[in-house]
């Protein structure tokens, strides 16, 4: 498997002048748009440059002016990531300048998959396979321009006056510089990837800097759009067909006896050990992991994001048996990590109930959509989420391997086969 969702560099920040290109995630009503803007001849003539930052305290004062439409590029989120990233992840922060003006910001993550056990408890046999050998030798050190902990385009935010092709070219040069920095530390990068973009946005990468990159897609991002007529959870239930109303009622009946509570900072800190146990119970049973969260991750997120980060505990007989986390990103609700006791999960349909609870939270609080992310595609579609294809770009550092990357990728990352469900009534029902 090639990990496409993709911390400890101490080198000084480097400034490199380059031509550059820019793209922007801009929050407008209910959707993310990709904008091209015309710039004056005077602005286009100014040199574009990039600067790589190792620490958030180095970021320019105007950083958050560009990040205001995406919490996952805000300084407070990046501070949390800097303080509580997975042990095998190295983050850098990139500013793109037109002259002295900051016109784009970006996040990069280096993942060293050789330093962790990527395969879950049920997949130990894969350690001996040819596939694992090829993965370890040729695709285990990855530089991601984006955020491997999330689904969607959280790589970059750009000023409305910047030129997209110039910003993208600057980011390409920043990626090259990062690879050189790691190489000087004895780390040869295998893969470089820009993630995740909608299919309509990939055309912006048609430029020489990306001509040798593989365009790829893996599991889709599952997104539930909240209909305007849904003013309550009951409205959502009423929109379902009989089969899925029955599924909803059955799951709620199974969950009787479970109490739910949103935990504050002190409660999250007090429950760190149990939260980690429940999280690892889920993660270790996944077929593949690119990282594992540290125990203090949720505590730090709550410290930094405050009310924008929500951790809801599920209790039975006053014992924590599961939890879910969510992050408020403007009018979009992003689901984050969760954990549960698998034996209780099966009996109480805990995971399905968590999905319903997140949907109810989004409806009650006026969100336009929920980002459910990848994995568990079929069950997420059964509560109304629809697949959105995300496209990434990938390039291998070996000029010999790179032309064969499509074959290599398809072998290590086979297409996921699943059946999409539609829980809502059709016009004929």
Where are these predicted regions, by residue range?
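Acyl-donor-binding surface of acyltransferase catalytic domains
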Residues: 1-5, 13-41, 145, 163-257
């Amino acid at each position: 498997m090639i990990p496409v969702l993709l911390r400890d560099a101490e080198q000084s920040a480097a400034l490199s002048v380059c031509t550059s290109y820019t793209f922007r995630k801009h929050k407008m009503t209910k959707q993310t748009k990709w904008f091209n803007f015309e710039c004056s001849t005077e602005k286009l003539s100014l040199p574009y440059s990039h600067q790589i930052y190792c620490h958030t305290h180095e970021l320019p004062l105007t950083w958050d002016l560009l990040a205001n439409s995406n919490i996952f590029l805000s300084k407070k989120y990046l501070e949390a990531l800097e303080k509580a990233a997975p042990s095998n992840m190295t983050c850098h922060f990139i500013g793109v300048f037109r002259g002295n003006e900051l016109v784009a910001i970006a996040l990069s993550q280096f993942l060293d998959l050789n330093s962790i056990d990527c395969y879950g408890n049920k997949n130990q046999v894969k350690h001996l396979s040819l596939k694992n050998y090829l993965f370890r030798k040729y695709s285990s050190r990855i530089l991601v321009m984006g955020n491997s902990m999330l689904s969607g385009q959280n790589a970059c935010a750009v000023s409305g006056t910047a030129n997209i092709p110039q910003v993208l070219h600057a980011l390409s040069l920043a990626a090259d510089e990062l690879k050189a920095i790691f190489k000087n530390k004895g780390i040869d990068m295998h893969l470089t990837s820009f993630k995740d973009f909608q299919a309509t946005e990939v055309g912006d990468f048609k430029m020489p800097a990306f001509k040798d990159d593989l365009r790829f897609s893996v599991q889709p991002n599952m997104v539930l759009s909240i209909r305007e007529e849904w003013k309550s959870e009951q409205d959502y239930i009423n929109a379902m067909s009989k089969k899925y109303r029955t599924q909803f009622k059955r799951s709620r009946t199974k969950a009787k006896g479970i109490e739910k509570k949103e935990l504050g900072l002190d409660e999250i800190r007090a429950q760190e050990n149990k939260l980690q146990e429940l999280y690892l119970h889920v993660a270790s049973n996944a077929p593949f992991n690119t990282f594992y969260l540290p125990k203090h991750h949720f505590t730090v997120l709550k410290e930094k994001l405050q009310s924008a980060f929500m951790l809801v505990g599920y209790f039975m007989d006053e014992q924590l048996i599961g939890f879910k986390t969510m992050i408020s990103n403007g009018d979009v609700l992003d689901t984050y990590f969760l954990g549960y006791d698998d034996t209780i999960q099966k009996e109480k349909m805990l995971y399905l109930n968590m999905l319903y609870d997140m949907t109810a939270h989004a409806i009650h609080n006026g969100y336009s959509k929920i980002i459910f992310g990848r994995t568990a595609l079929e069950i997420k579609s059964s509560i109304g989420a629809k697949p959105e294809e995300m496209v990434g770009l990938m390039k291998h550092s070996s000029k010999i391997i790179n032309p064969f990357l499509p074959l290599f990728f398809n072998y290590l990352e086979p297409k996921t086969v699943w059946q999409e469900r539609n829980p809502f009534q059709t016009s004929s029902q």
